[in-house]
Amino acid sequence: MRGFGPGLTARRLLPLRLPPRPPGPRLASGQAAGALERAMDELLRRAVPPTPAYELREKTPAPAEGQCADFVSFYGGLAETAQRAELLGRLARGFGVDHGQVAEQSAGVLHLRQQQREAAVLLQAEDRLRYALVPRYRGLFHHISKLDGGVRFLVQLRADLLEAQALKLVEGPDVREMNGVLKGMLSEWFSSGFLNLERVTWHSPCEVLQKISEAEAVHPVKNWMDMKRRVGPYRRCYFFSHCSTPGEPLVVLHVALTGDISSNIQAIVKEHPPSETEEKNKITAAIFYSISLTQQGLQGVELGTFLIKRVVKELQREFPHLGVFSSLSPIPGFTKWLLGLLNSQTKEHGRNELFTDSECKEISEITGGPINETLKLLLSSSEWVQSEKLVRALQTPLMRLCAWYLYGEKHRGYALNPVANFHLQNGAVLWRINWMADVSLRGITGSCGLMANYRYFLEETGPNSTSYLGSKIIKASEQVLSLVAQFQKNSKL
């Protein structure tokens, strides 16, 4: 099996569920901390295999299984987030690439090129350089993957590493590089050829339904009747499992089968279907309304993209006439971004330049207070949706601002919003922004009740994805572009 390393068979990948560990306090100081750090250094010295000389790379025996098992056991015994972060930081900093070897091999390649030596000599020198660029800890990860449950352990280890980085317990280029190396290895082990597409129905095993319910991160499942609706008529639920662990969800996709592109999430997750028997002639659109990763250690591994592509093919087989594919997506971060803009406007200008004069006047008349402070108070809660006048008054400016947030706000040239970036990378079109599309508490406080449709025109997804990834061009509908133009005209930024 490509990518799993010699000798790794299907039985090696156990279900990717580890018991949760409490984060605990930071690393202790004093004698206890010193003893723990010395134990870490000794463990790493024994567990991380040395890099064999280039000539012996295929003749050196693998390290004893016990050495890798010792690392797994030691790491599993660290209950505190800070302790695990300390060990991972020491691994990244002390067992990466030998920079001296890299410099030496690079000089050798350059020298051979200048001498215009024959291709075979140059290719071998380049292979030596490539070998020198492999960090030592990669060997540790490779050998751990051969242990029973080893890949499961590495998925959890990467989840811990990402958490430690987010908490700033461990930082630096060495740590980022190790994260990238481990992500690359996991991407090979979890590539699409090793993944099974499984559909969930009400007759699926109870433990699968329970896992799907627990994994739902976008629109939480309230009870068993709620779950039954989401896998019942006019609904589909699919997940990827690894070929060695059927029935163990890695990433989950929920789909609504409708007559048009949905604009309200409550109509999907709360309302009962029109009938218990599906009328196929009424199903013309497939709406992807939730996608959830169950393993945080697999962040950045392209499971979601592969899952959508596989589900589209599955739905086309079941409904050959199905022609419309779209998401109904949350807009996480919009309210936070807007509140940040309001705060900066107050500090820099002392007035609101996001809303037109007439909009400011209307909102002030309804609320009876100064526009900036009132808006910050309103948007920090969900109470404003109780006022029909406020809902009407805020619709035009918030739609305009949301369009700009999705289309115009960038991070390194790509969409700032992570959900937008995901669908645009897949080649979807930013199709429509929907007002009062999610009136749940989470929807109102997180994105002012707004949601977006990203539409997948199947024949255009390839060119759109290439255009976005290569030229950073966002394909958007007339509705979105019109709202963006209004923002640029009316908001004095």
Curated annotation (Swiss-Prot):
Post-translational modification, as annotated: Acetylation at Lys-472 activates malonyl-CoA decarboxylase activity. Deacetylation at Lys-472 by SIRT4 represses activity, leading to promote lipogenesis.
Site (Essential for catalytic activity): 211
Residue ranges annotated as motif Microbody targeting signal: 491-493
Gene Ontology CC: one annotated term: cytosol
Catalytic activity of the protein: malonyl-CoA + H(+) = acetyl-CoA + CO2
Pathway(s) annotated for this protein in UniProt: Metabolic intermediate biosynthesis; acetyl-CoA biosynthesis; acetyl-CoA from malonyl-CoA: step 1/1
Consequence the record notes for mutating residue 302 to G: Decreases catalytic activity. Increases affinity for malonyl-CoA
InterPro entries in UniProt: Malonyl_CoA_deC, Malonyl_CoA_deC_C, Malonyl_CoA_deC_C_sf, MCD_N, MCD_N_sf
List of residues that carry N6-succinyllysine: 168, 222
Tissue: Expressed in fibroblasts and hepatoblastoma cells (at protein level). Expressed strongly in heart, liver, skeletal muscle, kidney and pancreas. Expressed in myotubes. Expressed weakly in brain, placenta, spleen, thymus, testis, ovary and small intestine.
Domain of life: Eukaryota
Primary localisation category: cytoplasm
Xref: Gene3D superfamilies: Malonyl-CoA decarboxylase, catalytic domain, Malonyl-CoA decarboxylase, oligemerization domain
GO biological process, alphabetically ordered: acetyl-CoA biosynthetic process; acyl-CoA metabolic process; fatty acid biosynthetic process; fatty acid oxidation; malonyl-CoA catabolic process; positive regulation of fatty acid oxidation; regulation of fatty acid beta-oxidation; regulation of glucose metabolic process
Locations listed in the record: Cytoplasm; Mitochondrion matrix; Peroxisome; Peroxisome matrix
Region (Catalytic domain): 191-493
Protein's recorded name: Malonyl-CoA decarboxylase, mitochondrial
This protein's encoding gene: MLYCD
